[in-house]
C-alpha cells in the first residue's frame, strides 16, 4: 500500500498485530477492542513518515490497544499494564513515574496525529450486528471470527468497506457449511470474496504463527479453518485508495493550543456535570461554553475524555445535539478542554421558571426525539438523559453532556457495560434492579420520563434513593409480569405491598393521545419498548391527530 509508512514492513507489522492479539487474549479484551486497536495503529502509521525503532513500535502497538480499550472496555488497560507489557519493571517509583510520563506523551502524540478520531466500525462489529439480525446458527460463528482476524494480517483491509467484508465473510461461512461445492463459484463473483480468499490462503501458508494464534482463540482446529484449495488469478488488483468509513462529518474541528487555554478567563461558571465543569468564555470574539474535565491521575488522559470528544465529533451538526467547537488536552494539568455551543439554561431550570405553551412543548418533545433518533442511528447511546443534561436556548432544545455516552451493538443486550449510569429519576428499571444487561433502550425509558416532564412540568418517578424510585415506578406502572422481570429480585428490591395494576400518572390525563406511547417507552421489558424512530413517528402522529 503506497500510502503506508515505507519503513514498516509486512513482517514488522504482522509481528505487532500478533502480539496485540496475544495481549488481548491474556487481558480478555473484546474482539472489537483488538480489531479497533489495529485500525488505530494502521491509521497512525499512515500519518507518519519517519522510521520508528523497535522500542517505538512496541510502545505504539500497546498504546493503541490501551486507547481502544478506553473506548470499548469497562476495565481498560492502565499505564501499569502498559509498563508490564513493555517489560518495564523497576522497583523505583520515581523512575516508573518518569517512564509513565514519557509513555503518556507518546499516547498523546498518537491521539493528536489522528485528531482524536479513534472510533472505528470494525469488520467484527458488523459481523456481530449481521449475526443478530439474520439469527444465524452458532456453528458459523468461530470461522467468521477467524476470518475477520485473519484479514488483519496485512493492511489491505483498509482498502475495503468493513461492512461489505463482514457480509461476505458470513456468506462464505454459510456456503462452506451448507454447500461447499459452490465456494469456487461464489469467490469468482466479486472482488471482496477474492480478497478474503487470497488473504486467507496467504495467512494459512505464509503467516503460520499468526494463523495459529488466531485459531487458538477459537474452538476450531486448524483443519476446520483450512483454506479451500482454489487457485485465483495473480492479476487481481485491490483498490488503490483507502476506504473511508463515514463515521465523522466532513468538518474540521479546532484543536486548541496550550497558549489558547492559558489565556481563557474561567470566571463565569455555568454549572457542573458528572465529569466536569462548564464555563461561559470568549473565544475569537465569540461567546461559547467551555467544558473542563480534570483527571485525578497525573498526565494520564481519561477514557471519558476520549469518548466525549469522539461522541461529540460524530454527532456534530445535528440541530438538537450540542455542537463541539474545539478541544485540547493539557497533559501537565491532566485537563481536557472542550468548546461547545453556548445555551441559555438547562431544561430542569427552565421548567421551574417558565410556563411553557402547548406549541413549545410539542416542539421540545419532537426535537428531543429527533436528537435521540439521530444519536441511535449513529450507534451511540447517551446513558445519562436527564432534564439537567437537556439544554435550552429560546425555542431550541439540545442534548448535552456526552461524558457517559458510548457505542452500542445493535439491539442485543450487552453485559459488558457499566451498570452505574443514568441519573436516578431517569434510570431504566433494568438498571435499578441490576438484573438485566442493557442496550440503547435505557435511553428510551429516560426519554419517556423527559417527555412526561416537558408535558406536565412534573417528574414522573421522583425520589432521592433507588428504593424510593422503584416504589414510585411500582405505584404508577404496577408489578412487572414474569416475562419482563425476575419477580424474586423485584420483591427484594421494592419491599412494598403489591398491586397488579398501577395508578398511572394522573397529570398525563391531559394528554390522552400521548400517554399510551409514553407507557410503551416505559415498558419493564426493554425488548418491548419502541425504538427511537418508532417513538418519533408515533408521537408526531399523536400531535397531528
Swiss-Prot record:
Residues 264-543 form the Protein kinase domain. It is an enzyme of class 2 (transferase). ATP binds at residues 270-278, 291. It comes from the Viruses. Its EC number is 2.7.11.1. The active site is at 384 (proton acceptor). Keywords: ATP-binding, Kinase, Nucleotide-binding, Serine/threonine-protein kinase, Transferase. GO terms for molecular function: ATP binding; protein serine kinase activity; protein serine/threonine kinase activity. Belongs to the protein kinase superfamily. Ser/Thr protein kinase family. This is Putative serine/threonine-protein kinase L673.
